[in-house]
């Protein structure tokens, strides 16, 4: 069911303009109007859920997720224990679905694993830029992108900012995941450690903790707190995507 449109939004000029701009395909301009609308209703649960849906339709996935997190926080504080499947599908969207699906199929990589990485890396913000310089949806470092880029057979020379292009970023990111997948025999934990901290770091940790057969114990033994959290969150994301979208 569609979340009812609050009257305060229906008569809001920002909403009217956003709807008109979205209808003619001007999604970037529509999102700017929505951002102005957000300021006036961000603490209204019904409005937040409704607005996150509009962000989603306009391609504003990261904005939608931030609003949904706000909704989730308010719902928890107000004693709401369960959230609808509709909420969770917006909270874990199949954003950039065609690019993720086609590249994952070609590289024989689990698309839910890729979705889990993108959600954790950038919250589906194609313009995301880390302090270290990682760019785009899958937060690819320029040095890594430059190594992967020749395999695309694109004629234009590589520039770091091409990593902000969603389709190309996913193409290169999935290629890199595929390389790690082959290198580490499909071990998701090892792939994620390598993706986050580097293969050389994984090699060092395997010498120290490789004897630990229990996966949870091994993950808890990861020395870098950031990498430990990253691995847990991406594996959780992958599990939720599988639960929400797997045909079985």
Describe the predicted segments one by one.
Residues 1-8, 17, 24, 29-31, ...:
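Catalytic glycan-binding domains that act on GlcNAc-containing polysaccharides
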Residues 11:
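Primarily a LysM-type cell-wall glycan-binding module
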């Amino acid at each position: 069911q569609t979340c009812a449109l609050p009257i305060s939004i229906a008569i809001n000029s920002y909403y009217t303009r956003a709807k008109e701009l979205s209808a003619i395909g001007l999604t970037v301009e529509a999102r700017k109007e929505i951002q102005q609308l957000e300021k006036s209703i961000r603490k209204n649960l019904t409005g937040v859920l409704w607005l996150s849906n509009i962000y989603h339709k306009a391609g504003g996935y990261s904005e939608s997720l931030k609003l949904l997190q706000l909704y989730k926080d308010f719902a928890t504080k107000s004693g709401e224990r369960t959230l609808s499947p509709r909420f969770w599908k917006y909270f874990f969207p199949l954003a950039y679905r065609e690019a993720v699906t086609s590249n994952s199929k070609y590289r024989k990589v689990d698309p839910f694993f890729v979705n889990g990485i993108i959600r954790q890396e950038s919250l589906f913000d194609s313009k995301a830029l880390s302090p270290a310089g990682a760019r785009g949806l899958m937060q690819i470092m320029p040095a890594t992108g430059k190594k992967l880029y020749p395999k695309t057979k694109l004629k234009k020379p590589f520039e770091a900012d091409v990593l902000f292009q969603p389709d190309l970023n996913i193409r290169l990111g999935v290629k890199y995941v595929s390389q790690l997948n082959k290198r580490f025999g499909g071990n998701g934990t090892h792939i994620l450690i390598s993706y986050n901290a580097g293969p050389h770091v994984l090699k060092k940790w395997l010498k120290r903790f490789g004897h630990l057969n229990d996966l949870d114990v091994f993950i808890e033994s990861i020395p870098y707190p950031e990498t430990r959290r990253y691995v847990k969150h991406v594996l959780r994301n992958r599990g939720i995507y599988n639960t929400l979208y797997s045909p079985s």
